[in-house]
Each structure stands twice: as C-alpha cells, then as structure tokens.
Amino acid sequence: MARRKAQVAGQHSPASARLTNPTAGAPAVGRWLIFRYEPTTLFSLKMSRATSSVGRTLLIPTQYAAKMAFVDAAFKVDWRGEIAALVAALASVDVRIGVPERAVVTHTIIKIRQEPKDRKSGPAYIPAVAYREFVYLSGSLRWAFDLATAPEWLAAALIEIAPAINYIGKRGSFVQFVGYGREFELGPAFTQPLDGVELKPTSGMQIAVLDDFGPEASFEALNSFSPVPIRRDRHRVFRETLVPLGLVNVGPGFSEYSQEPG
C-alpha cells in the first residue's frame, strides 16, 4: 500500500455520527449492505498461528482482510476522502462474511527459498520445503456491512471503492467484483461471531478464529510501511466465529467443505 494521504474533497460526517436511518446511504433498502465477489483463482489466507514452514489456510477471508481490501482499493480509485477517517469508520462497522457453497482445500508440499538461520555467512537464501494449503471456492463470496453501526457517509464510500477490489490479503487470491445489494436480515450462509455465546457447531459448521480491526485501529498502525507497531486487542482483534462450512469429504491431499444441506 502506498504510504500517502488522500486529499479531502467535501465534508464527511464525523466517524462518531451513526446512521440514524439504517436504510439510508445507498440505493434500495435494508440494514445490511452486501458486496459480492467471484473468486477467479485459488484462495489462500494463513491462519494467525501459521508458521513460515506450515502454512495452514482459512477457508474464507476475515473481516480484517475485507476491510483492508477497501483501504487498499481507496488508493487505487484516488478516493477523495481521508484514509484515516475510512479506517476509523471501518473499525466501528460489524462485518459478516457470506461463504460460498463449497470449498475444497488442497494440501501440498512445495519448494521455497528462505533466509538461513546464520545470516552472516553463506547465501542470502537457501532452498527448503514447506507445507501449503490452497482453497478452490465454488460460489461467490459476500461481505455484509451493518449500516446501523456505520457513519452515514460510509455506504456511499464503500460503493464507490468496491469495484476496484481485485484481490484479498496478499496478492494472489484474486476476485472479480460482481455487484452489491441491500438486505434487512442475513441468511444462515453468513458467519456469526460467538462473543461469549455458547453455540455448538453442527455437522455443517465449524468454529474459526478470524481477525478484525480493533477499536483503536488507525492507518498509521495498520500500514505495513509505518514504524508504528500494531497492538493486539487495540488495533487488531481475534474473535471465535461460527463459519457455516462443514467437512463432507476427505481424500489423499484434499479436504472438502460444504454448507449444511437445506
């Protein structure tokens, strides 16, 4: 992400102003503003506990990855608002991820080059092998933003930025913007944070730890090129989340997940 400040054009509502009418700010009606993306390549997003040699992947993007995709795309479209205000607004918004109909994970061993433990002598990089997982997603990904928790100006900003998003996380997990819409309620195909609620996943669900913007998230802290350190529970939080994808089939080198039938 280029480290620069976007110029301000016009006046935006302050981040503290909440949407008094959850159906305002975007065409159609409904509390949830939902963006739909079609995966065009294999998806991979390492779990928070993954190591460089064992790269297990999540099945879906996290809220953090979705929000960072909007921040990155804001630079691409030369968005005329303040990036700092966008990050602060996204930090306050509840986001749910709509899962695809099916996900197939391939388990692979690949050759990589990594820095040696002794960096003072020898080559800068040495050959090694690593475990990697990649996901084939059958169906669209949907990102639902709760407008009742958003500043009034955010809906229009997201709609302007959304078409410029073409990858998730690190470059490689490419997606194609399909469109957006509004819904009053979300269906069972969307993630649900546990937040202390005792829910037992059924055969068509699983619990995963997904990250999100923290309450004090700022562009300076989240920017990879900034010297400001990112702090857990302040700038970035991790939440146990119910993901409506359950294991339905396993075989040599793959695992298949699907939404609960019906």
Spans of model-derived segments:
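Conserved active-site/ligand-binding neighborhood in enzyme cores
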Residues: 2-262
